[in-house]
Amino acid sequence: MATLKEKLIASVADDEAAVPNNKITVVGVGQVGMACAISILGKSLADELALVDVLEDKLKGEMMDLQHGSLFLQTPKIVADKDYSVTANSKIVVVTAGVRQQEGESRLNLVQRNVNVFKFIIPQIVKYSPDCTIIVVSNPVDILTYVTWKLSGLPKHRVIGSGCNLDSARFRYLMAEKLGIHPSSCHGWILGEHGDSSVAVWSGVNVAGVSLQELNPEMGTDNDSENWKEVHKMVVDSAYEVIKLKGYTNWAIGLSVADLIESMLKNLSRIHPVSTMVKGMYGIENEVFLSLPCILNARGLTSVINQKLKDDEVAQLRKSADTLWDIQKDLKDL
């Protein structure tokens, strides 16, 4: 007796499952992981989305909740499992998993605890998707991107840290607000470490090709009567401010990660400030990852732009590198 489905649908091709073309995996379904997931779905970047976490009930609940929105999405397959086999054949894997910093905990201790988590996660990712590009989002992102590169054995053009893509977006938003224009028309770069020691490249800030530092030579210095330096301070403080108000940050980083993925999956060769291996650049001698303007396309992170930095900006970058290396050099089991 033919089933309803057989009566309704006449098969033309064999019913074998197609290998996905643009599969994306998100590891960790906390606030940041799910913001990444919804941003990826909202931009229709994936033909399959896989979620992985150790919390099985939470994981299944998030998967079902997204699946129930399938009518409003163009992503035909959404899957989840604590077993990494569900991630097989991913083009891009976003890592948001990790332990939270405890009150009074040193950064080194937090990093070492996250290294121990990554030692389980990263080999599993590479086992099932050996050709993937990994985007690291977990903090401290620059150090954990280095850790991922070490543990994965992947070439450095396929291990990327979300880095200062969000810091630069915050910078452009805050500058644009002051000027009354859209952030996409206000150009400026935050480089270096994602976080407290990031570097604002004031010499490159421009609107419609007009250098703002030429209009106000004191811009970004302590002598500036308009106090533009405060904008960079607001960028650095903004995460702490949001965390104080709502407990965590998630929407902006989720949108930022989807922006990076779009440049890669659509082979756009757009330039983003993301974390990459900077040894040999700007006189940095250690294997550290910092954000520089990088070209992202279908091959991953293919090139770095040689930004013309002023002496004090280079000094700040090197200081960032030293700060990170001080922590990295003491990490165990890499």
Swiss-Prot record:
Keywords: Acetylation, Cytoplasm, Membrane, Mitochondrion, Mitochondrion inner membrane, NAD, Oxidoreductase, Phosphoprotein
Record localization: Cytoplasm; Mitochondrion inner membrane
Assembly and oligomerization: Homotetramer. Interacts with PTEN upstream reading frame protein MP31; the interaction leads to inhibition of mitochondrial lactate dehydrogenase activity, preventing conversion of lactate to pyruvate in mitochondria.
Name of the featured protein: L-lactate dehydrogenase B chain
GO CC terms: cytosol; membrane raft; mitochondrial inner membrane; mitochondrion; myelin sheath; oxidoreductase complex
Gene Ontology terms: biological process: lactate biosynthetic process from pyruvate; NAD metabolic process
Organism for this UniProt entry: Mus musculus
Top-level taxon: Eukaryota
Function: Interconverts simultaneously and stereospecifically pyruvate and lactate with concomitant interconversion of NADH and NAD(+).
InterPro entries linked: L-lactate/malate_DH, L-lactate_DH, L-lactate_DH_AS, Lactate/malate_DH_C, Lactate/malate_DH_N, Lactate_DH/Glyco_Ohase_4_C, NAD(P)-bd_dom_sf
Keyword check for rRNA processing: no
Phosphoserine modifications at: S11, S44
Catalytic reaction list: (S)-lactate + NAD(+) = pyruvate + NADH + H(+)
Binding-site positions, NAD(+): 30-58, 100, 139
Modified residues (N6-acetyllysine): K7, K58, K119, K329
Pfam families: Ldh_1_C, Ldh_1_N
Residues the record lists as Phosphotyrosine modifications: Y240
Catalytic residues identified in the record: H194 (proton acceptor)
Classification via CDD domains: LDH_1 (cd05293)
Pathway: Fermentation; pyruvate fermentation to lactate; (S)-lactate from pyruvate: step 1/1
Top EC category: oxidoreductase
Residue numbers bearing the N-acetylalanine modification: A2
GO molecular function annotation: identical protein binding; kinase binding; L-lactate dehydrogenase activity; NAD binding
The EC number(s) this enzyme carries: 1.1.1.27
Family: Belongs to the LDH/MDH superfamily. LDH family.
